[in-house]
Amino acid sequence: VLQACPDTIFLGHAPGFWIHISGDDLSLKDTYPEANAPVLPGGRIPELLRKYPNLYCDISAGSGRLALSRDLDFTRKFLIEFHDRILYARDYFDNKHQELLNSLSLPVPVLEDIYFRNAERLLAE
C-alpha cells in the first residue's frame, strides 16, 4: 500500500505496528517485548521509513513508548534519523512520553519536529 499510494500519508500506530521496530522473531508479537529488550537489526519500521517517505510514526499509544523505551541508544539514533516523520500525540493524561523524549538529550530541532512541526506540516497540506 505504501508503494501503491505514494501520495497518501500513512501513520503507523499501536502494538501491531510498533512490534516491528526490531528484528525480533515475529512469534513475539503475542507477547510484546518488555522495556530493556535490545532492538535487533532487521526491524521493518526502519526499513520501511527509509524506503517510503509517505510513512509516519505516531507515538501516542503506550506501545509507541514501550517500543522506544526498549533500547535507548537505538531510540536516540532512530528519532534523529526519522525526526521529520515522528508524530507526538497522547491518548492518556500522563507525562511518560515527554519524560522519555526529554531524557534522550535530543537536539532541540529534533524535539520540535516531533512535538509539533511535523503535525503542523501535515495539517497544512
Regions found by a protein language model. Give the residues of each.
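Mid-to-C-terminal alpha-helical segments outside catalytic/metal-binding sites
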Residues: 81-87, 92-125
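Catalytic pocket-lining loop regions of alpha/beta-barrel enzymes
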Residues: 1-87
